[in-house]
């Protein structure tokens, strides 16, 4: 009788402890997303920031698929997630043809080291600037930020034109 009571009590305690442990619905949460326009380098990129909300298995990777403003296939970025990182930033390669007030989508997949999907996030980017505000060529070159002679001509004129060929 006493043995049965001990087993029943332990089983009940085990069930209660298991019920108290919350299974994490998400491991990552989007904390910010924006376009970064860098006039000095004549570049535009997507920047997505996330915070870790639960432990992520070692060897996990983020696979981000950014909509390509020029059209065509998405821009794909693979980035390893390190266990000590509480905040994670993902930045795309340089973009061309970003249009003001047009929504652009990104899909972020968190996969483990075996490629198993752990979580999928979606976000929408919208720029309050058109990429035509950027020059086609960087304003500066080199480590000393020297004026770019292709933009700042020897005769005193400047060429800030944007020569991107974008779909209408």
Enumerate the language-model features and the residues they cover.
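Short, solvent-exposed, Trp/other aromatic-anchored flexible loops in extracytoplasmic proteins
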Residues: 84-121
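Bacterial N-terminal signal peptides that target proteins for export
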Residues: 1-9
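Contiguous beta-strand segments within globular domains
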Residues: 31-52, 57
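Bacterial signal peptide processing site
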Residues: 21-23
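Solvent-exposed serine/threonine-rich low-complexity stretches and specific carbohydrate-binding patches
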Residues: 71-88, 123-127
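C-terminal motif of bacterial Sec signal peptides marking the signal peptidase cleavage site
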Residues: 16-19
């Amino acid at each position: 009788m006493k043995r049965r009571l001990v087993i029943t009590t332990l089983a009940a305690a085990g069930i209660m402890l298991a019920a108290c442990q919350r299974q994490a619905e998400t491991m990552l949460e989007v904390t910010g997303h924006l376009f970064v326009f860098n006039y000095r380098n004549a570049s535009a990129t997507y920047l997505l920031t996330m915070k870790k909300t639960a432990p992520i298995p070692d060897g996990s990777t983020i696979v981000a698929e950014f909509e390509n403003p020029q059209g065509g296939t998405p821009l794909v970025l693979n980035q390893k997630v390190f266990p000590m990182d509480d905040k994670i930033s993902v930045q795309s390669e340089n973009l061309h043809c970003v249009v003001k007030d047009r929504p652009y989508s990104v899909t972020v997949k968190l996969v483990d080291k075996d490629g198993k999907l752990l979580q999928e996030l979606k976000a929408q980017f919208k720029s309050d600037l058109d990429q035509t505000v950027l020059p086609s060529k960087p304003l500066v070159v080199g480590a000393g930020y020297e004026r770019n002679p292709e933009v700042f001509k020897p005769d005193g004129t400047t060429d800030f034109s944007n020569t991107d060929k974008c779909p209408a």
